[in-house]
Every structure is written in C-alpha cells, then in structure tokens.
Amino acid sequence: MNNDRGIFILTVFKKILDKLLYFDLYDDIDSNMSASNIGARKKRNIKNHLFIIYGIINSVVNGKEDPIDLQIYDIEKCFDALWLDDCLNDIYDTVSAENHNDKLALIYESNQENLVAIRHPLGMTTRENIPNIVQQGGTWGPILCSNSIDTLGKKCRDRKENFYLYKGVVKILPLAMVDDLNGIAKCGIQSISLNTFLTTQIEMKKLRFHVPDEKGKTKCHKIHVGSQRELCPILKVHGTEMEMVEDDTYLGDIISGDGKNSKNIQKRISKGIGIISSIMTLLNKICLGEFYIEIAMILRESMFINGILTNAEIWYNLKQSEIEEFELLDRSLLRQILQVPLTTPKESYYLELGILPIGIVIKMRRIRYLHYLTNLKETEMLHQFFIMQWNNPTKGDWTQSVREDLNDFGIKFNELKGMSKRFIKKLIKKNAREYAFNKLMEMKEKNSSKLGQLKYKKLKRQTYMKQTKKNIINIFKFRTRMADFGENYRAGYDAFLCPLCLEHLDNQQSSLKCKSIQDELKFKNDISDIYSNEITDETIQIINSIIKIRKKLIERDSTAEVTF
C-alpha cells in the first residue's frame, strides 16, 4: 500500500466552485510568486528550469566557473502530507491585501470535510471523513502545493542568500516544479548552507524529502559538476547522507555532470524505436486508402517527432552527429512506411513527402523558444539569465547555436521582440521550408544520380501521395530507382541482364521492351511521365502491371528450375 497512489474525483458542484474561486485569485497568486517554482503556472514550462540548469553546467564544464553541486530533491508523498492550514496561510501571504477576504475562507471551508471512498477492483469502500486535506486532482491542489514550496525561493530572494550567481551576476534561486526541487550552489560551504536551508524549511512545513528505503534506493541525489575537490562536502537529507551520482533524472531529462547529451539521446532513441513499432502496427492494421500517407505523416509528427524531441530545443552543444542519430531513426520510420531498402537516397524521402528533416525541426523549435525568451519581462530571472548568456557566451552555450539558426533562416534577432506568436510561427515555418529545400537540393545534386531525372521547384508533397498505399509505394520506388531491377542495385558489379528475356539490361527504362512483359501487358504507353509532377492513371497501372508480371514470371522460372 505504501506505493499506491490515487487522485480525488470531485463532485461537479465542488469543481465549479473551485474553478470560480481559481479564476478570481490565480492572476494575483501568480504575479506574487517568485521565479523559483514553475508548477501549475501559465506560460511557464519545465524547459525554463532545464534551460538554466544546462546553461550553468556548461559554464562550469566549458567555462571558468567554480565547481558546483546540483542538489536534486523529491518530497515524499507531498500531497498526502501537505497541511491545509499551512498552505492557506501561504496563499494569504502571497495574494495582495485586496484579496484578503471571504474567498480564501471559502477555499478553506470547502476542504475541511472530505467524505472519501476508494474505488478498487471489487467495488467501492464506505465513505470516511478525512478533514483538512489538499486534494490532489482538484483545481486548487497543484497551485497550493507550488505556492507553498515557492516560499523557499521567496526566502532566498528576500534574504539575499542561498542562491547561485550565474557568471557572477544573475541570481538563480532553487528551481522547483511543484514538489520536485533542484538546488544549485558552489561546492563547499555554500553547498552545505543550501542543503541545510532546504532540509530545515521542508521539515518546518511538516514534510520530508525521500530518504533511502530498505533496498537503499532514494530519489534525492547530489551531482558534482567540475573538477573534484578534496574537501567536497558530504550533504545530508534528514540526517542521512545524500547519495552522489554522475547523472539523475529531473523533469523528464537526464542531467549529466559532464554536460553531455548522450544519455538523453540514448533514452530518446530507445523510446523512438517503440513509437515506430506502434505507428507501423496502426498503419498495417487499418485500411486507410488514399489517406495512407496523410495519416502516416500526422502520426510521425504527433507521436514520433514530439515523442523523441521533448526538450531537445533547449539542449546545449547539440552536435551534428547527435542530430544525425535522430535523423537515422526518422528515416527508418519513413523506409518502413514506403517499404524501400536502406540504400534509398535520404533526400528523396523529404523531397517526395514534402517534410522537414529532424535537424531543421530542432532549429525551428530553438528559434520559437528564443522568441519566448526575448518577450519575457526584463525582471524575470529566466530573461536575465538568457541576456547574460547572449552577451557573454561560453563555448557550447545555447545562444551560439540559436545565432546560427537565425542566420540560416534569415531572421534578425532585434526583430523578434514584439512579434506576435502567430506571426513568428508562420515566418519560421516559411523560412525553414526554403532553407530545407535548398539543402536537400544540394544533397540531390551532389550525392544522388538516382534522382537525376526528378525536378523540384519547392518543398511540397508530390500529388501521387494521395494514391492508395500500393500505388504510392510502387511509384516512389520507380521515381527513386529503388524498384526490384538488377541495375538499380549493381553497386560496382558487372551489368545485370533481364532475367526474363536476357536481351537487354535489367533496368526500369528497358522494362517495356522486354518481350516477356509485352506479351502480358495490356497497355503499351510510354511511362516517362513517372518523373513528372503529374503522373497519369495509365502510367500507374502500367507500373503496377510490370511489377506484378515480373514477380509472377520470376517465381515461375524459379519453380521450374527447382522442378527440373
């Protein structure tokens, strides 16, 4: 039972009451909270804290900053242990004087008596009154918890102590996401001071951090970043020594003391393989007709790209080789969708489907996050952190990467501020597609003789992609010279003759000349329009017939040889 968790399913009346009170008080609460806790707050995201953490690690690893300790804490059963009186007192201290009224009293009164029943596999228990609780799953639960934990950040801010100075200037408070807490301090006395402060403040709220269980596992860890010191302090959590690790999971990402992205990428690659399997299962089980490619691309965007690129836009020092790992996995998905071999020219997927490579998607997301940063209030901790990094970059800083992105897309930094979110999104999308098209055409001209007959004017999905699955696959193979002809896979070997008539080379161009195929082919038209933007229905039928006839005759000849 110790690991069982649940949320409160509230009555409709209680939900409506909570929402009405929440709408009246939220803006006042949010405006008076510090930048320490981002949980349950609008227009704030886990990316904000990760962006700061990665930036500080990079400034230590690649800059001249002193070694630091990252102190990662998790509060044990936080919502179960929260004290309603303490949470409402914290809300009272947070809101302005004009909201010191009956609304706060109404929140308190509505949570004093809670008739709770537990739903389990065998039914439901009888209802018992559990007084004065913070309801996890209710409207007020997350913001009450975030505001209560935010008092730690406020005390650091107001007392001007237990914060980290980024590049000696920007004050970084302890970073929290509801009940997940990350403290940053220079290794030494400052680290001990922060550790003592956080532990004491949590105990004063009648809460506890996780301590090692009977198996020695704990959710509270210390990551040392930078050169090791002889007097690197031992930190404690409620009297128990804090475990020191090389990396730890925080807000969904793996934070590594060496500042590298390798473990995050390995984790996302593994996740991506599972997502590809799920996508292909869906596509193969359901008959989608002419919507096959459209739905496949929607699944690629929503499940695959969003699944593997979570937070990737704020990673520091992301190398091209690391991006290529993602693109390799992406092409694996596209290969399975189009049923083509590994040797298919990689630029052909994007030019034929009208989609963007993963690397350019990351660039787009980086610029969108840059737009978010530039439009923050100048008093915001995150904005000050960003401006310091923009003006005083360290090798490997995020701002160096995004400067290159702006240059690639032809967007000026000083024009970002003031642009609407909708406008910048459209501008980035337009410029990204132009940039991607130019890069893909360079690859086509440089690397791929197979695509020599194909002409493109812009990056868009080819019209034949609205055909059925079988037609799309066969046309794509013919256009990219990946159909099952010997000359398409010669790779330096001697010429291949047609296995059916042995009178000409076994290639796509000569397939209509084959006597064996001509005897069974109903249509005699030219199929040169296969390389154009408008492919006729007759050409599609001829291609399907050629593939079908070749397969049948080759299988027949193979069977005859075995029988003989």
Model-derived features with residue positions:
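Catalytic palm active-site di-aspartate
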Residues: R5, N37, I68-F79, I133-G137, ...
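Mobile genetic element proteins and their domesticated derivatives, centered on retroelements
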Residues: R5, L17, L21, L25, ...
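Family-specific functional microsites
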Residues: L282, I286-G289, M441-K446, K450-F564
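Short, conserved micro-motifs composed of acidic
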Residues: I107-S110, V211-E246, K267
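Conserved, non-catalytic sequence blocks in retroelement Pol enzymes and Pol-derived host proteins
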Residues: I9-K14, I38-K47, V60-G63, E76-D80, ...
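Conserved pre-catalytic core of RNA-dependent polymerases
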Residues: M1-T151
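Basic, alpha-helical interaction scaffolds
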Residues: V178, G239-Y316, Y372, E380
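Extended C-terminal regions of large enzymes
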Residues: L299-E301, E325-D330, Q339-G486, R490, ...
